[in-house]
Amino acid sequence: MGNHLTEMAPTTSFLPHFQALHVVVIGLDSAGKTSLLYRLKFKEFVQSIPTKGFNTEKIRVPLGGSRGITFQVWDVGGQEKLRPLWRSYTRRTDGLVFVVDAAEAERLEEAKVELHRISRASDNQGVPVLVLANKQDQPGALSAAEVEKRLAVRELATATLTHVQGCSAVDGLGLQPGLERLYEMILKRKKAARAGKKRR
């Protein structure tokens, strides 16, 4: 698990566009990004060490009665020295997942700054954002509504579709509905983009 970060952005060009959606998981260090990734992959809690580079996994998520949707998920390290490289990994992504530690309220202002910076980057404008308020299993964790308020999610660009979901990497709570909502937002954006092209 874990690879070194590079300036080269990941690409899904080797995959048919209908086969997998490219999603990047970012957030501050110790927010639980990698634990969430492997909870989705293996359906169990995996204790992880800080990601020094990135992890990537293909994850199939069941949606209703369909066969489900496949996400190619890139989990990128959140240490301060690695954050300038986030843009290389979010370029051309279908969706952003921003993970916060809801039990560590004192770092939410720092998380807010990073969320607004990455979502307003020229390459990411309009990209749907799912905020996962992780560690809901811990006492004192802030609710999704409180996290949404602290991060000023509604102040992101009006063209950016957003959703804040409480979750826990320990028991998997909230992950399925969160990813379903992300998928809906990605589809909505793609449909709007197609409609815009037809009007030209």
Curated annotation (Swiss-Prot):
<dbReference type="GO" id="GO:0005886">
    <property type="term" value="C:plasma membrane"/>
</dbReference>
<feature type="binding site">
    <location>
        <begin position="134"/>
        <end position="137"/>
    </location>
    <ligand>
        <name>GTP</name>
    </ligand>
</feature>
<comment type="similarity">
    <text>Belongs to the small GTPase superfamily. Arf family.</text>
</comment>
<dbReference type="GO" id="GO:0005730">
    <property type="term" value="C:nucleolus"/>
</dbReference>
<dbReference type="InterPro" id="IPR024156">
    <property type="entry name" value="Small_GTPase_ARF"/>
</dbReference>
<dbReference type="GO" id="GO:0003924">
    <property type="term" value="F:GTPase activity"/>
</dbReference>
<feature type="binding site">
    <location>
        <begin position="75"/>
        <end position="79"/>
    </location>
    <ligand>
        <name>GTP</name>
    </ligand>
</feature>
<dbReference type="InterPro" id="IPR027417">
    <property type="entry name" value="P-loop_NTPase"/>
</dbReference>
<comment type="function">
    <text>Small GTP-binding protein which cycles between an inactive GDP-bound and an active GTP-bound form, and the rate of cycling is regulated by guanine nucleotide exchange factors (GEF) and GTPase-activating proteins (GAP). GTP-binding protein that does not act as an allosteric activator of the cholera toxin catalytic subunit. Recruits CYTH1, CYTH2, CYTH3 and CYTH4 to the plasma membrane in GDP-bound form.</text>
</comment>
<protein>
    <recommendedName>
        <fullName>ADP-ribosylation factor-like protein 4D</fullName>
    </recommendedName>
</protein>
<dbReference type="GO" id="GO:0005737">
    <property type="term" value="C:cytoplasm"/>
</dbReference>
<dbReference type="InterPro" id="IPR006689">
    <property type="entry name" value="Small_GTPase_ARF/SAR"/>
</dbReference>
<dbReference type="InterPro" id="IPR005225">
    <property type="entry name" value="Small_GTP-bd"/>
</dbReference>
<keyword id="KW-0342">GTP-binding</keyword>
<keyword id="KW-0539">Nucleus</keyword>
<feature type="binding site">
    <location>
        <begin position="27"/>
        <end position="34"/>
    </location>
    <ligand>
        <name>GTP</name>
    </ligand>
</feature>
<keyword id="KW-0547">Nucleotide-binding</keyword>
<feature type="lipid moiety-binding region" description="N-myristoyl glycine">
    <location>
        <position position="2"/>
    </location>
</feature>
<dbReference type="GO" id="GO:0005525">
    <property type="term" value="F:GTP binding"/>
</dbReference>
<keyword id="KW-0472">Membrane</keyword>
<keyword id="KW-1003">Cell membrane</keyword>
<keyword id="KW-0449">Lipoprotein</keyword>
<comment type="subunit">
    <text>Interacts with CYTH2; the interaction is direct and ARL4D GTP-dependent. Does not interact with ARL4D.</text>
</comment>
<dbReference type="GO" id="GO:0006886">
    <property type="term" value="P:intracellular protein transport"/>
</dbReference>
<keyword id="KW-0963">Cytoplasm</keyword>
<dbReference type="Pfam" id="PF00025">
    <property type="entry name" value="Arf"/>
</dbReference>
<dbReference type="GO" id="GO:0016192">
    <property type="term" value="P:vesicle-mediated transport"/>
</dbReference>
<keyword id="KW-0519">Myristate</keyword>
